[in-house]
Regions:
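Conserved H-loop
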Residues: 65, 151, 244
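Active-site acidic/histidine proton-transfer and metal-coordination neighborhood
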Residues: 18-19, 61, 75-179, 279
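Histidine-acidic metal/acid-base catalytic patches
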Residues: 1-6, 13-30, 54, 60, ...
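N-terminal pre-domain/capping segments
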Residues: 1-104, 109, 146, 266-279
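Residue-level preference for long, well-ordered alpha-helices that form the structural scaffold
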Residues: 44, 48-51, 90-97, 127-130, ...
């Protein structure tokens, strides 16, 4: 089967959003992973519903599907990266993150996006209390999204409270309707699952998928061919399980070379997929 590829806009921050979308479409991508941020579709700028309606028309005109990503570094706090989170100690801070995620759900509903992806946050020393906060927050967001027919997917992130797929499974058992946002590169940084095994084991629960190369045991997103990932095995697994959702390249530190990397990375993935035999 043919996989559907997208590219995360966090790797296109030197491009205006309209130019970035045109680059993706012209390069042959099927969609975009839209990270709501100061550079692209700022959710706190005026007239978000009107801008979302215009963006949907643009996406439809280019033939691009979408997922909404929520990992902006300084959108909520210009002085603390990725703060606040669902496990922040201050209740008002947690409420700010929940409100932001609900706004992202609204954007996803307006765009007709396939999913909204988000992560847990780095826990305090009291992991039991942090876990309780996480379950409460995710439950609230998933319930809000369900009323709007939007899929929520939590992404295991190395070093966060949901660090790997096993942590996600525990969370999903507590929050019905939650899906998995699987960044396959993270699997070789933490956890016991090989990336291709994770794809196969969690195929029915996949809400969003990201791919990139990555050095083993180091959380560095790299272009295909620049790390230790067995990308053919991951692509074969996605194909074997019949994954029909977007497979999003996340190269957030490569905006300076996006003009050449966007088409080159897609060509590399397609070549690897064509050479990946089914298992």
């Amino acid at each position: 089967m043919s996989l559907r590829y997208a590219y995360n806009t966090n790797g296109l921050t030197s491009h205006r959003l309209d130019d970035a979308l045109a680059l993706l479409a012209d390069s042959g991508y099927d969609g975009v992973a839209l990270t709501l941020d100061v550079a692209h579709h700022d959710p706190f700028a005026p007239d978000l519903p009107g801008r979302s309606a215009a963006l949907r028309r643009r996406l439809d005109g280019l033939g691009l599907a979408s997922v909404v990503e929520t990992g902006a570094r300084f959108l909520l706090d210009p002085r603390r990266k990725h703060h606040p989170t669902l496990v922040s100690a201050d209740a008002d801070d947690r409420a700010r993150r929940i409100a932001f995620l609900k706004t992202c759900v609204d954007v996803a509903a307006d765009l007709g996006s396939e999913a909204v992806s988000f992560w847990a946050g780095v826990p305090s020393d009291d992991r039991t209390t942090s876990w309780s906060w996480l379950v409460d927050g995710v439950t609230e967001v998933v319930g809000y999204a369900a009323d709007r027919s939007v899929t929520c997917a939590v992404e295991p992130e190395p070093g966060m409270l949901v660090d790997d797929c096993d942590d996600w499974a525990r969370l999903a058992a507590a929050v019905p309707g939650l899906t998995l946002a699987l960044d396959t590169g993270h699997c070789i940084v933490s956890g016991r699952w090989a990336p291709d095994d994770a794809v196969r084991a969690f195929a029915p629960q996949l809400g969003a998928v990201a791919i990139e190369d990555m050095p083993r045991a180091r959380h560095e997103h790299r272009a295909p061919g620049e790390g230790d990932m067995d990308l053919p095995a991951v692509l074969a697994a996605l194909r074997d399980v019949g994954h029909g959702g977007l497979v999003s390249l996340e190269l957030s530190r490569d905006a300076h070379r996006a003009d050449t990397l966007v088409p080159a990375a897609l060509a590399a993935l397609r070549a690897l997929n064509e050479g990946a035999p089914p298992r």
